[in-house]
UniProtKB/Swiss-Prot annotation:
Main EC class the enzyme belongs to: oxidoreductase
Key words, A-Z: Cholesterol metabolism, Endoplasmic reticulum, Heme, Iron, Lipid metabolism, Membrane, Metal-binding, Microsome, Monooxygenase, Oxidoreductase, Signal, Steroid metabolism, Sterol metabolism, Transmembrane, Transmembrane helix
Database matches in InterPro entries: CYP450_sterol_14alpha_dmase, Cyt_P450, Cyt_P450_CYP7A1-type, Cyt_P450_E_grp-IV, Cyt_P450_sf
Disulphide connectivity of cysteines: none
Expression across tissues: Liver specific.
Outcome, altering R103H: Correlated with elevated serum (24S)-hydroxycholesterol levels; 30% decrease of 7-alpha hydroxylase activity
Catalytic activity: (24S)-hydroxycholesterol + reduced [NADPH--hemoprotein reductase] + O2 = (24S)-7alpha-dihydroxycholesterol + oxidized [NADPH--hemoprotein reductase] + H2O + H(+)
Family designation: Belongs to the cytochrome P450 family.
Protein name stated in the entry: 24-hydroxycholesterol 7-alpha-hydroxylase
Pathway(s) annotated for this protein in UniProt: Steroid metabolism; cholesterol degradation; Lipid metabolism; bile acid biosynthesis
Signal sequence extent: 1-23
A Pfam family reported for this protein in Swiss-Prot or TrEMBL: p450
Length: 469
């Protein structure tokens, strides 16, 4: 018995050490999982996901996992987790979004993975800073044309005003003029279907289409629209230099590498990416500017010094003009900081350690630009609209402020970010040059219902405009 006891003790000791090491290696962040199988805390999370994330951070600390709708989402909020999110080779962007792309645009996963990098390189080249000068002239012309439709004066919801300007401008520039009808009934249809598709995009990315009848109908409407118009879009060439529009270049890659059957689906995905964020950014920027009289006055003085005081002329906006109106660019960037997307995501492909926790493969690693931009450590007085903070950004070298993540970061940042900034800047310049504008309602609260993209306003915000004389 005396000989057995030491042996048993050694075995038990080794077993205890092994279990201790295993426990250490498998130590995971606190998990909020609820009690309903598969759904988890999906109902609570879905009611107000942005608020849910912040409350969880306060309660559980800088890293925590949320189990909802069959997904484990691990949120990181401090430097170490952010660095892993941005730099680790153990996390992957494409695998994180492939299901979303499949559900919202019906693009097969194998097709998406095969084409994504090629399309990204094309988009980045075509929409990059080197080529921005090619867009300024047409942007100006398209915006002038749509501003004419507003008349000399009026009152309308600011969000609708921006939609009526930017929907046709963006489609005409990046897709083809034939896609956006001039027929009032069809224009109304386009607006209605896109708003439904956009507003429920997040639900469409997670739930079966049979539960989202109106969203599914809108999706099918756009797929049919592209299927009908793609032959004409492909046949149309630029009268100036025979160059291709963004959609034409996309279709060229899609049909060369796969099949023309996927073309309408990529048309829909590109349409959503082009319109879903530009419109709310322009809305919020105008709303912030018009609700800050000192900033509004400074911008108007800048516009008058560059273009003169009258608002009747169809001015042309050059790159030099934009440089002389930097305050407007700062306002756009400050708006994007305050109204950043709720989350960006990566998929964990190999277990990764963050703050002594092990995040297992299969988890979705989540970072919230919305809350990161409200951390006073990175942005002092984070809730205030302070465009002047952007003086510190090296915008000449196309660099943002540290920890500004609205366009993502790393290998797959938004490839059209500089075009989007240009479009919103020019939209604001031309509106404020042509019209005296004032808000009839207070700045609305934002909706906390969605995590994807720039948040929408919760209520209406009417604008009164009158042509400057």
């Amino acid at each position: 018995m005396e000989l057995i006891s030491p042996t048993v003790i050694i075995i038990l000791g080794c077993l205890a050490l092994f279990l201790l090491l295993q426990r250490k290696n498998l130590r995971r962040p606190p998990c909020i999982k609820g009690w309903i199988p598969w759904i988890g805390v999906g109902f609570e999370f879905g009611k107000a996901p942005l608020e849910f994330i912040e409350k969880a951070r306060i309660k559980y600390g800088p890293i925590f996992t949320v189990f909802a709708m069959g997904n484990r989402m691990t949120f990181v909020t401090e430097e170490e987790g952010i660095n892993v999110f941005l730099k680790s080779k153990k996390v992957d962007f494409e695998l994180a979004v492939q299901n979303i792309v499949y559900r919202t645009a019906s693009i097969p996963k194998n097709v998406f993975l095969a084409l994504h990098e090629k399309l990204y390189i094309m988009l980045k080249g075509k929409m990059g800073t080197v080529n921005l000068h090619q867009f300024t002239g047409q942007l100006t012309e398209e915006l002038h044309e749509q501003l004419e439709n507003l008349g000399t004066h009026g009152t309308m919801d600011l969000n609708n005003l921006v939609r009526h300007l930017l929907y046709p401008v963006t489609v005409n520039m990046l897709f083809n003029k034939s896609l956006f009808s001039t027929n009032k009934k069809k224009i109304k249809e386009f607006h209605q279907y896109f708003q439904v598709y956009d507003e429920d995009f997040e639900y469409g990315s997670q739930l079966p289409e049979c539960l989202l009848r109106n969203w599914s109908k809108s999706k099918k409407w756009f797929l049919e629209l592209f299927e009908k118009n793609i032959p004409d879009i492909k046949a149309c060439k630029s009268a100036k230099d025979n160059s291709m529009t963004l959609l034409q270049a996309t279709l060229d890659i899609v049909e060369t590498e796969t099949s023309k059957e996927n073309s309408p689906n990529y048309g829909l995905l590109l349409l959503w990416a082009s319109l879903s964020n530009a419109v709310p950014v322009a809305f919020w920027t105008l709303a912030y500017v018009l609700s800050h009289p000192d900033i509004h006055k400074a911008i108007m003085e800048g516009i008058s010094s560059v273009f003169g005081k009258a608002g009747k002329d169809k001015i042309k906006v050059s790159e030099d003009d934009l440089e002389n109106l930097l305050l407007i660019k700062w306002c756009v960037l400050e708006t994007i900081r305050l109204k950043a997307p709720g989350v960006i995501t990566r998929k964990v492909v190999k277990p990764v350690e963050i703050l002594n926790y092990i995040i297992p493969s299969g988890d979705l690693l989540m970072l919230s630009p919305f809350w990161l931009h409200r951390n006073p450590k990175y942005f002092p007085e984070p809730e205030l609209f302070k465009p002047e903070r952007w003086k510190k950004a090296n915008l000449e070298k196309h660099s943002f402020l540290d920890c500004f993540m609205a366009f993502g970061s790393g290998k797959f940042q938004c490839p059209a970010r500089w075009f989007a900034l240009l479009e919103v800047q020019m939209c604001i310049i031309l509106i404020l040059y042509k019209y005296d504008c004032s808000l009839l309602d207070p700045l609305p609260k934002q909706s906390y219902l969605h995590l994807v993209g720039v948040p929408q306003p919760e209520g209406q915000c009417r604008i009164e405009y009158k042509q400057r004389i």
